[in-house]
Design a protein with these regions (language model features):
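N-terminal single-pass transmembrane signal-anchor helix
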Residues: 2-35
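Generic hydrophobic-segment detector
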Residues: 11-17, 38, 43, 55, ...
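Short alpha-helical interface patches
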Residues: 20, 36-40, 72-80
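Membrane-proximal N-terminal amphipathic helix
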Residues: 38-64
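Generic N-terminal initiation segments characterized by hydrophobic and/or small/turn-forming residues
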Residues: 7-10, 29-31, 43-47, 78, ...
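Short, flexible coil/turn micro-motifs enriched in small/turn-prone residues
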Residues: 2, 16-19, 44, 60, ...
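Periplasmic/extracellular, small/polar-rich flexible segments of pilin-like filament-forming proteins
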Residues: 55-128
Length: 128
């Protein structure tokens, strides 16, 4: 019998590898779910900011007596969005967060105070 040998046996190494494999199998899906969850949170925050900006813009036009129609440019400038990539056209605002893309729509496309307020919503294709 050799005394003073240090190290791990093959069985001990296999047990450690199996434990690491189990931990990885549990941790990776949790990490991916957290990434999606944080991206959804960012999108919900931006949506809330856009809706608030839309309401403030509509109210300020009523108070100021302005009846001209407004569009996404006015809403986005009023929202002062930072930290995410986004583009917008006449009807759709598209943003990317965490590698996921979200789209919001303005309806009607030419809201006009004081009679025609706009609604910002997620189309049916947007999944949370």
């Amino acid at each position: 019998m050799i005394r003073g040998r240090k190290g791990f046996t093959l069985i001990e190494l296999i047990v450690i590898i199996v434990i690491i494999g189990i931990l990885a199998a549990v941790a990776v899906p949790q990490y991916l779910d957290l990434t999606r969850s944080s991206a959804n949170g960012a999108a919900r925050g931006i949506l809330g900011g856009l809706r608030s900006a839309n309401s403030l813009l509509f109210a300020s036009r009523i108070i100021g007596g302005t009846t001209a129609a407004y569009n996404w440019t006015n809403v986005v400038n009023n929202a002062q969005i930072q930290g995410v990539e986004y583009t917008y056209g006449t009807q759709t605002f598209t943003m990317t967060a965490g590698g996921y893309t979200y789209a919001f729509e303005l309806s009607p496309t030419d809201p006009q105070a004081p009679t025609t307020p706009a609604t910002i919503y997620c189309p049916a294709t947007t999944t949370w």
